[in-house]
């Protein structure tokens, strides 16, 4: 007999479609992930396997209630790894655009540079990470993806920084300096909801220095 199953994007799966029991929460309970003989293992010797996808741009800074729902939804899908992708994206007005929210981006572009965090955006980012971790969802963290360098960043490009600038972060001295600064601030900042920095959190599986570095 054919039966209609309703799956709502804002609600966790239920019944036989709820795969959250497959996750081993909280993320990080078995220690850091490491490689051994071509496979992934946790520090305690348990084999590590991951299933996940991207959360991009403005989706990295949901409000607290939405963050809870997203974590529940992902866990119910059996997802145990989320890529925090393009959290450095510039602000944009359209919800469907490849951009951060105007009021709560991770990076604060308001002062004509891209060198500090927006307090509200950072709080949302931290809370989202904490909710994912609680559900047993691990993290892949991107560094430079869509960062839009501003005049105040003092880039050494005549007429301003070119588009799709991430490719230049491989060899441009000023960009390397700015990206080191960003990485240190992002990875060493202590999340008040977990009590750990990303650098010290075993829920972080991988850190990607440069997105699509050959693009």
Over which residues does each language-model region extend?
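Active-site mouth of glycoside hydrolases
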Residues: 30-215
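N-terminal pre-domain segments of enzymes
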Residues: 1-30
């Amino acid at each position: 007999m054919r039966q209609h199953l309703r799956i709502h994007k804002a609600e966790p799966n239920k019944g036989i479609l709820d795969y959250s029991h497959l996750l081993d929460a909280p993320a990080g309970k078995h220690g850091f992930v490491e490689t051994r003989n071509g496979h992934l293992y946790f520090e305690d010797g348990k084999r590590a396997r991951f299933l996940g996808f991207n959360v991009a741009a403005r989706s990295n800074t949901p409000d607290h209630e939405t963050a809870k729902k997203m974590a529940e939804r992902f866990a119910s899908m059996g997802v145990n790894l989320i890529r925090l992708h393009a959290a450095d994206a510039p602000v944009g007005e359209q919800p469907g655009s490849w951009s951060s929210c105007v009021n709560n981006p991770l990076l604060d572009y308001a002062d004509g540079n891209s060198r500090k965090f927006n307090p509200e955006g950072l709080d949302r980012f931290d809370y989202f990470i904490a909710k994912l971790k609680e559900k047993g969802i691990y993290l892949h963290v991107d560094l430079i993806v869509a960062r839009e360098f501003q005049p105040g960043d003092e880039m050494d490009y005549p007429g301003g920084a070119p588009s799709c600038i991430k490719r230049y972060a491989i060899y441009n001295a000023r960009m390397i300096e700015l990206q080191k600064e960003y990485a240190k601030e992002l990875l060493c900042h202590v999340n008040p909801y977990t009590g750990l920095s990303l650098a010290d959190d075993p829920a972080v599986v991988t850190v990607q220095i440069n997105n699509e570095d050959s693009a």
